[in-house]
Amino acid sequence: MLLLLSPAKSLDYTSPLPPLEATAPRFAEEALATAQAAAKLSARKLAGLMGISDKLAKLNAGRYADFAGQEERPALYAFSGDVYVGFEAKTLDEPAIGFAQDHVRILSGLYGLLRPLDLIRPYRLEMGTRWAPGRKKNLYQLWGSKISDALAADLLGEGSDVIVNCASKEYWHAVDQAPPKGIRIITMDFRELAPQGLIFNSFGAKRARGMMARWMCEHRITDPEGLKGFDSDGYAYSAEGSDDSTWRFVKTR
């Protein structure tokens, strides 16, 4: 079983790291080629493509201009957005991190598919960006079936046929455009109970995705049915609103 997460825009390349054995991304060459192509874009062009401030655009233009010289850090510790606040990797023990390496995957516009301990350089490139190197119109075209093929290979290696989707729609589309055959896909839907009824809280859902990934690693869950026991931060599985392909979890407090 593999659980998929989105990456994060926020990065942390300064906090101390625990002792760990980092790994190399499988699509490192593709990432370098894309970064080199992005280095040819002006900061102004990057700002327009990514919808970011001039300051952020200049920062990322500089990163791409010297991409090979940028510091590397394991993906799980480099990303620091809401999902990774929920995951809180720095407080997990070594066996749980090892389990994450085997059972968690992070989707990426630049790197395609990452294991938690794969080394990455700082970047900003959302999967939905309407740009790609060469004659491709966007990153979905660039990646094609590569991400799904890699997921299928990883699942085959562990003798499993289940993907737990805790990624955003933007990133999940990179898999769903060419879904791996013969694989059961379960999408997690996180809601909150409010006075006006059930609501979708984007911030809360992102944190919940990370918390579920952490909970899975802490409890060494390898059967999706075990995830129905997820109870972090007041969440509980709800049969109402769930079906075979979508499982709803509701936060009641």
Swiss-Prot record:
GO biological process terms held by the UniProt record: response to hydroperoxide
InterPro entries: YaaA
GO cellular component: cytosol
A Pfam match: H2O2_YaaD
Family: Belongs to the UPF0246 family.
Protein name as annotated: UPF0246 protein Swit_4565
The organism of origin for this protein: Rhizorhabdus wittichii (strain DSM 6014 / CCUG 31198 / JCM 15750 / NBRC 105917 / EY 4224 / RW1)
UniProt lineage: Bacteria, Pseudomonadati, Pseudomonadota, Alphaproteobacteria, Sphingomonadales
